[in-house]
Amino acid sequence: MTRSLKKGPFVANHLLRKIENLNLRKEKKIIVTRSRASTIVPTMIGHTIAVYNGQEHLPIYITDRMIGHKLGEFVPTRIFRGHARSDKKSRR
């Protein structure tokens, strides 16, 4: 189910404050956050946000094509190492 339009997108307050402060000063710093549920809004374009994946903070450069998506969509939390191999040779 999608979010109601009258509520607007969810963006963590601390993240929004940091981005607005950097936009006022016209600085480009890496913003470290754990808020994977925050929606990417147009004020974030051009910033690099390091999002926590459970082990480390992975930096993401925000572009205009990412608007409307969540930060967590761009940071994988699981590592796929491939399916288990079949042991047909050892069974013979």
UniProtKB/Swiss-Prot annotation:
* Entry's Gene Ontology cellular component terms: chloroplast; mitochondrial small ribosomal subunit
- Localization: Plastid, Chloroplast
What is the similarity comment for this entry? Belongs to the universal ribosomal protein uS19 family.
A GO molecular function held by the record: rRNA binding
Concerning PROSITE patterns, the annotation shows: RIBOSOMAL_S19
Name the job this protein performs: Protein S19 forms a complex with S13 that binds strongly to the 16S ribosomal RNA.
The organism's superkingdom is given as: Eukaryota
Keywords, A to Z?
Chloroplast, Plastid, Ribonucleoprotein, Ribosomal protein, RNA-binding, rRNA-binding
- NCBIfam families xrefs: rpsS_bact
Biological process according to GO = ribosomal small subunit assembly; translation
Instruction: Specify the protein name.
Output: Small ribosomal subunit protein uS19c
Q: Which InterPro entries match?
A: Ribosomal_uS19 (IPR002222), Ribosomal_uS19_bac-type (IPR005732), Ribosomal_uS19_CS (IPR020934), Ribosomal_uS19_SF (IPR023575)
- Provide the primary localization: plastid
HAMAP family per UniProt:
Ribosomal_uS19
SUPFAM superfamilies listed in its UniProt record: Ribosomal protein S19
